[in-house]
């Protein structure tokens, strides 16, 4: 990643609402340069979306679950492709999900094959989510373990933030 790209990314991690003009002023480059860099980062898929990080407890969510699952058998690439190919069916299935799931990915560790992170308004909603995970089509679940986070507990060490990537990007750019 070029220096100007890293700097634009760092500023966007801090605040993605800033205009290209504001970014250009902060970075001491021209506004068209910022626009070109941002457009290129979007086209290359480095920037996938612009979003906010709210106080989820003020939106009514009380729990975050990090769910680790082990499968009885691996899900084949063909099955994954088939599921992606049936987008309408997947949207309908997702609408049956009682909780917003922010990530669901295959991986390794904690005696698990996949991990999901979801938000829940009640413990009952969390248990419905676990039932939803167990009945997912074409996936045979062997074991599920969860880690629950109480969003109303004010003694957390660090709340969700992406702004830490700003310093990281700039620091690692200097090291390379």
List each model region and its residues.
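A compositional/biophysical signature of low hydrophobicity enriched in polar/charged and small residues
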Residues: 1-176
